Amino acid sequence: MISKVNKYPISFVKVIFAYSLYIALVFNYPLLAKVHAMFEMYPHDSEFFEYFFLFLLALTILFLLAILFFIFGTRYLLKPFIFLLLINSAILAYYKKNYGVSVDEGIITSLFDSIIEKNYHEVYDLLTNELFVKIVITALIPALPLYFIKIQYPKLLKEYVIRLSYICGMLIVWIAIVASNYKDISLTVRANRYLNKDVIPLYSVSSLLNIIKHSLSFKSAYVQLDEQPSIYKPEEEMVGIVVVGETARADHFSLNGYSRKTNPKLEKQNLSNFNNAYSCGTLTKTSVPCMFYVGDYASFDVAKANQRANLLDIITASGVAVTWFNNNSGCKHVCDQVKTIDLTKIYSEEQYDEQLIIELDKILDNNKSKKTLLVLHSMGSHGPKYYKRYPKEFDKFQPSCKNNNPQECSKEELINAYDNTILYTDHFLDLLINKLKKQNKKSFLIYASDHGESLGEHGLYLHGVPIKFAPEEQIHIPFFIWFSELYKQDRSFTILDAKTKISHEHYPHTILDAMQVTSKYFKKEKSLLR
């Protein structure tokens, strides 16, 4: 019987160093190979230093892991802690290898939000057979010895002395090694600061600790920014539609010069298109709160933004009827104070974005408000299941990727599937514009994507690279405005030059300007209307 298995006694110190060495070398081998390739491309004056730096990098990861185990791996927690870290490392290594993604605070909180908000489809989309095989081979099998060993600990006081001694000893050794060649080491590290995000699992562990730290910090009371905003001609009817796009790239919109006709319908509409627009984040978790933020853009912080009124709150306070329609992963607290219609809770299965129009019609048909703002959070081009974002009749570009793992499709198949999502977005937005035309009122539509998407460039897939390291593909977004003829007849204005570099910072002020809402937080110089 399993309960009678003889367990081999072994010191807790040996267990800690054995698993620290395994994680440091097996899961971080790609990082070490990356650094080696870096030296081959940009050789150092001394070949000895190149190998010395590789040794130091591996030793640093080993020591940090061991210190982590010595601090948190107490006698009752060491085995489960090692097990969890192995599982965590296997998952991180899989996503780093397959998608080029480093799991940071943004991705972790986004994942937690998806679970809390019951947006399980986002989690399911990332689960693959290859991932489970990776977990079994690199985590579960190496964890088996933990069952067959009995970890030996000395008396409690002696155990603490041993733990402290090893921690101090490792720090002394590390400092001595670094001090022996500090100048070259510091120069190399400063020139490659991004490498820290590739360390598995330490970068994600530190990100998780930061999240815990922030969650335990004091939260200030909700701040109402502007209790008395006003609106121009409150008795006049006007309908505004704001579409929050998902994962759309500017360079895959034919509106922006893409060789394929991915926007055949929008090209026939009289749009004001901006082809040099950039997002403020690479995750919906960050971008959506940022898009509706009306404070100092340079000091934007998601946690602080959630504790103060946003664009929608100000517009609502001016007397406009605001409704948020969700077909995505939630509004990230932006719509907490306004009416919300959530398709993910109405329907048991994922819906195409056209379903948003059916729900929108119900509001417009029974609308008694003079001023209305409808915000649609679309599913857009959300990956990795691009093929599930559009009906079969929009599967125009062939062959298209039908795999949940984009890296397993050819480049042609992947781009075809992604372009089909843009083609469907074109159709969806065209339907909205035509619906506004039929309203025969002053109306407008503003569209901007929350962020872009990597399709294999530089070995990256999906999105989520920290903004300061993010490639062009993940931050260059489509952004356009449409105004009805009645709107243009009633109001004299010009539009900012299409080639001007803009960002999400212009988004909330443009919406305020389009709705003609006056607020002390409105910055005319940040509006795209002149």
Ranges and model annotations:
Residues M1-N196:
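Transmembrane and membrane-interface helices of multi-pass
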Residues I71-P80, Y99, V103, I314, ...:
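Catalytic cores of PAPS-dependent sulfotransferases
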Residues V178-K402, H476, S503-H504, H509-R530:
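Active-site-proximal alpha/beta segments of enzymes that process anionic O-linked groups
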Residues V199-L202, I358-D361, C401-L445, I481, ...:
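A long, amphipathic alpha-helix that forms part
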Residues Y232-K233, K437, F469-E472:
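Short secondary-structure boundary/capping segments
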Residues G257-K261, K441-K442, I446-Y487, F522-K524:
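Histidine-centered active-site microenvironments of extracellular/periplasmic hydrolases
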Residues P391-E413, Y487-R491:
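Flexible internal linker/loop segments at domain or repeat junctions
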